[in-house]
Amino acid sequence: MANMFLMFYLSMIMFLFGCMVFVSNRKHLLSTLLSLEYMVLSLFIFLFFYLNFMNYETYFSMFFLTFCVCEGVLGLSILVSMIRTHGNDYFQSFSILQC
C-alpha cells in the first residue's frame, strides 16, 4: 500500500519536472517535444498505477498510449518539415505568421 503511494508521488514529481523543463527550454522544438513526451510518460505511469490500485481494467491505458504515439508522430512530422524549410529547429529563426 505504501509502495503504491510512493509511485503516485514519484509520477507527480516526474510530471512537475517535465513541466519545469517545458517552460524553461523554449528555444528548440526538439527539447520541447522531448519534455512533452516525458510528461506523457509520467502521466501514463500515474494512470497505470491508479487503474491497478482501483482494480479497474487497464484497457484505457492502451488507448492513452495510442493517442500518445499519434501525438509524438505529429510532433516529429512538424519537426522534420520545419528543418526542411528553415534548416534548424530554433523558434526565433522563423515567423509563426508566415505560411
UniProtKB/Swiss-Prot annotation:
Catalytic activity: a ubiquinone + NADH + 5 H(+)(in) = a ubiquinol + NAD(+) + 4 H(+)(out)
InterPro entries associated with the record: NADH_UbQ_OxRdtase_chain4L/K (IPR001133), NUOK/Mnh_C1-like (IPR039428)
Membrane topology designation: Multi-pass membrane protein
Entry keyword set: Electron transport, Membrane, Mitochondrion, NAD, Respiratory chain, Translocase, Transmembrane, Transmembrane helix, Transport, Ubiquinone
Residue ranges of the TM segments: 4-24, 29-49, 63-83
Domain of life: Eukaryota
EC number annotated for this UniProt entry: 7.1.1.2
Location relative to the cell: Mitochondrion membrane
PANTHER family linked: NADH-UBIQUINONE OXIDOREDUCTASE CHAIN 4L, NADH-UBIQUINONE OXIDOREDUCTASE SUBUNIT ND4L
Family: Belongs to the complex I subunit 4L family.
Function: Core subunit of the mitochondrial membrane respiratory chain NADH dehydrogenase (Complex I) that is believed to belong to the minimal assembly required for catalysis. Complex I functions in the transfer of electrons from NADH to the respiratory chain. The immediate electron acceptor for the enzyme is believed to be ubiquinone.
Protein name in the entry: NADH-ubiquinone oxidoreductase chain 4L
Upper taxonomic lineage: Eukaryota, Metazoa, Ecdysozoa, Arthropoda, Hexapoda
